[in-house]
Amino acid sequence: YKMKAIKKLPLFVLALLFLVSCQAKPATDDTDSDVSIVEWERSDLYTDADIQAAMDAVMTYFETEFKGCTLTQLCYPGDASADLFTEWAEECEADEAIVLYSSFDTDASGGDGSLEPNTTYDDFQWILVRDNGGTWEVKTYGYG
């Protein structure tokens, strides 16, 4: 039994290191103090300012359109999703697209009533587009 536990220890340590490397930093905007923005690796596609601007657009949209819901986490999935960005840009006839993922909680009313009450939604996608390096616009959102 102890040998099995010892063999599993390196996997446990790796899993722990992975979780620690995905630390969240609190958002700087006081109105969104419940939102944690997951640190992202440096992108070759977007500057940190581009990614932050997209996140700001989602937070603003969420605040006005998702009454009764609390945004708890927002993250950029990394450049590995570049093909997805390209597909969305083409579909939306835009120069660029970016996809962000979020988690949020609904209250007892289910937000505007269209969501399940008292539920946490994870890996909720936000698709944003822009032209000529302009302002990010939330184009669509949801699952998959």
Can you say where each PLM-predicted feature lies in the sequence?
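Flexible low-complexity loop/turn motifs enriched in small/helix-breaking residues
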Residues: 23-120
